[in-house]
């Protein structure tokens, strides 16, 4: 995290599924504007909309929000805002991609039509306590490992694009169930819940505003969430449950409670693993013997060691 003398910083997360006819031109103009405000972060622009997370001084973030909302396409965009004491991104990246989130479907789903009904945080809390409801985590395996809703189903996928195949292989688990999906901020569930409806599942819902909104809502305060929430910035993990903290993460090597993520020191692997500091040193920051012996091992380079 880039430290500064000013602690008045914000990080925002937002998305909007809305047609953007010329994503590249939009991207170029947007980059110049964000750069002029001194904002850092990552934004994806596609013909289907925008998905972004940015950090910067409070005044500049609010200028950005106000400016974006002046565009009729984004006048109803919901911004999830958190206070931070520094920039949480190293740089500004705005890319044009085919999809805001990659579900890799052969046929695109129409997000303007049938998608999972929204459950407000209070309604989601009620669903968490109902017996016949299937709570389905729509995030990646390393996100689930750090924290998740109690009794949520883990598809154990490495990438979001793996979810459709998981659904087809596990139809027996989902059939005739009330399915409630959740993700970090909601952008993945918009598309995933629409896919579920298209596949013939009728009783489909999604957590409105994602885990972030659930954790901050005064009536829910993140209850029945265990662990921490993985975020895609330099914080890596943030608190959701304001009532109690239950550690669910386990060290990759010894299985002890752990909430510290590292990337495998082999740059060609880069796998994220939960790992205590002493095990990082013991295993040279690598996830396997093969990776620890890699000639480009970053841990060894950092500590001026040589492979044996």
Curated annotation (Swiss-Prot):
GO molecular function ontology, one term from the record: oxidoreductase activity, acting on paired donors, with incorporation or reduction of molecular oxygen
GO biological processes: tRNA modification
InterPro entries, per database record: Rhodanese-like_dom, Rhodanese-like_dom_sf, Rhodanese_C, TrhO, TRHO_N
Reaction(s) the record says it catalyses: uridine(34) in tRNA + AH2 + O2 = 5-hydroxyuridine(34) in tRNA + A + H2O
Keyword tRNA-binding included in the entry's annotation: no
Active site: residue positions: 183 (cysteine persulfide intermediate)
Catalytic class of the enzyme: oxidoreductase
S-S pairs: none
Sequence ranges assigned to domain Rhodanese in this UniProt record: 129-223
Keyword Transferase on entry: no
E.C. no: 1.14.-.-
SMART domains per the UniProt record, alphabetical: RHOD
Pfam families (alphabetical): Rhodanese, Rhodanese_C, UPF0176_N
Keywords of this entry: Oxidoreductase, tRNA processing
Family annotation (PANTHER family): RHODANESE-LIKE DOMAIN-CONTAINING PROTEIN 7-RELATED, THIOSULFATE SULFURTRANSFERASE/RHODANESE-LIKE DOMAIN-CONTAINING PROTEIN 2
Family: Belongs to the TrhO family.
HAMAP family according to UniProt: TrhO
Function: Catalyzes oxygen-dependent 5-hydroxyuridine (ho5U) modification at position 34 in tRNAs.
Descriptive protein name: tRNA uridine(34) hydroxylase
Organism: Aster yellows witches'-broom phytoplasma (strain AYWB)
Lineage: Bacteria, Bacillati, Mycoplasmatota, Mollicutes, Acholeplasmatales
Gene name per UniProt: trhO
């Amino acid at each position: 995290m880039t430290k500064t003398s000013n602690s008045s910083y914000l990080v925002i997360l937002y998305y909007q599924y809305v047609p953007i006819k010329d994503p590249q031109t939009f991207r170029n103009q947007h980059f110049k504007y964000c750069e002029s405000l001194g904002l850092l972060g990552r934004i994806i622009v596609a013909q289907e909309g925008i998905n972004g997370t940015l950090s910067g001084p409070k005044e500049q973030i609010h200028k950005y929000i106000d400016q974006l909302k002046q565009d009729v396409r984004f006048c109803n965009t919901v911004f999830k805002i958190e206070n931070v004491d520094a920039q949480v991104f190293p740089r500004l990246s705005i890319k044009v991609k085919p999809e805001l989130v990659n579900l890799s479907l052969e046929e695109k789903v129409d997000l303007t039509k049938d998608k999972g009904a929204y459950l407000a945080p209070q309604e989601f809390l009620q669903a968490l306590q109902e017996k016949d409801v299937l709570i389905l985590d729509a995030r990646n395996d390393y996100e689930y490992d750090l924290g998740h809703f109690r009794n949520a189903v883990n598809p154990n996928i490495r990438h979001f694009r793996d979810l459709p195949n998981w659904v087809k292989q596990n139809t027996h688990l989902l059939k005739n169930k009330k399915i409630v999906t959740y993700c970090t901020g909601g952008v993945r569930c918009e598309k995933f819940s629409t896919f579920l409806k298209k596949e013939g599942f009728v009783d489909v819902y999604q957590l409105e505003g994602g885990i972030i909104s659930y954790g901050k809502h005064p009536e829910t305060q993140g209850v029945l969430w265990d662990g921490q929430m993985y975020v895609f910035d330099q914080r890596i993990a943030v608190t959701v449950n304001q009532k109690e903290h239950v550690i669910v993460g386990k060290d990759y090597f010894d299985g002890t409670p752990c909430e510290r993520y590292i990337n495998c020191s082999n740059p060609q692997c880069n796998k994220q693993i939960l790992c205590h500091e002493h095990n990082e040193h013991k295993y040279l920051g690598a996830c396997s013997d093969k990776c620890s012996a890699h000639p480009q091992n970053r841990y060894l380079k950092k500590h001026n060691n040589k492979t044996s």
